[in-house]
């Protein structure tokens, strides 16, 4: 076990016995020692980067801007008249989509923010349903749950698919939509919460890209955000992840139908977007998870002999869509990747994918705040539950350990799984138990 500093600050451990730190358990918890001898920052310094914006009042609008948003169930849209991005670019008439569940209490301090992933929408119940319901982490009888959509997404907030108010006929921004940052998202989302009358955030929970947003929310200070749960994430975009995303973007750029981003929204560069998604899906899994899924674990015969019919086929992949036989693991891999890619490409916009992946590259919680990541993490004083998996190939176990050691009042939760980065979805029951216990611990 790692050092148990800071545990005394929290109430007795509420986690169910099944989540106790046992050698072969599903989940392991450890309190991590804080960093010492770090400079002290005032609250004004902590919030300076996040609060330099004008408070404009959003208004509610039912407008649906594109077919991707139209595919969703009903959601709310807040509109902010002017918003200045970190880059200095000013956006006008900015829509921000959000979905909420439950009710605010009288003191308006029972709000739980759920930060979505790269390609998800604000409809959390469609992609994280296990965490919703009475007695679960997101208990709508206790909390006002809200998820706000990010800038650059095709699912309701301002992005490449939304109308440009300064363009002739208000045609969509397309590739002209300016680059945005995770801090931009958090700042504009706070404006929406202010308009809704939220006085204090009980907790912020997010995985992957949502975990990055979760960390940024913490810098509003403990008086506003009481606790955080970053999951499968990082404090700064790594070269490893940046390379994966750049490779995916190049697949889209190289599609002849991309047309420098000036394609018709109903005539997407589908081939490039599908290939990008295939690559992304590989980063979400681990080798053991893929081997197990497709019966390629050690000792299992996965290959097969090449038949005379196969030998006549070209190797350019153009006819591979009809060449798969049930029960053949190699073909099953191809079929799985192709199915997932086609499903995704039919529901997402290429320019939005580029905009959203570029947003990752801006992520660095120390930027403008501190001289190093540990120094920036030490400024987060809220209780924090950090959830990770050793099998995550995108955001490493070591990154989460550093996060835990540097946040003074933190606990590390290690989910025992081979699922890779996708563990927070594939092992949602374990994540639910951990988050629920942590929320109960300090919010009851």
UniProtKB/Swiss-Prot annotation:
SUPFAM superfamilies: alpha/beta-Hydrolases (SSF53474). Pfam families: Abhydrolase_1. GO terms for molecular function: deacetylcephalosporin-C acetyltransferase activity; homoserine O-acetyltransferase activity. Signal peptide: none annotated. Keywords: Acyltransferase, Antibiotic biosynthesis, Transferase. It is an enzyme of class 2 (transferase). The active site is at 208, 421. Residues 1-71 form a propeptide. GO terms for biological process: antibiotic biosynthetic process; homoserine metabolic process; methionine biosynthetic process. Pathway: Antibiotic biosynthesis; cephalosporin C biosynthesis. Its EC number is 2.3.1.175. Heterodimer of chain I and chain II. Catalyzes the conversion of deacetylcephalosporin C to cephalosporin C. Belongs to the AB hydrolase superfamily. MetX family. This is Acetyl-CoA--deacetylcephalosporin C acetyltransferase. It comes from Hapsidospora chrysogena. The gene is CEFG.
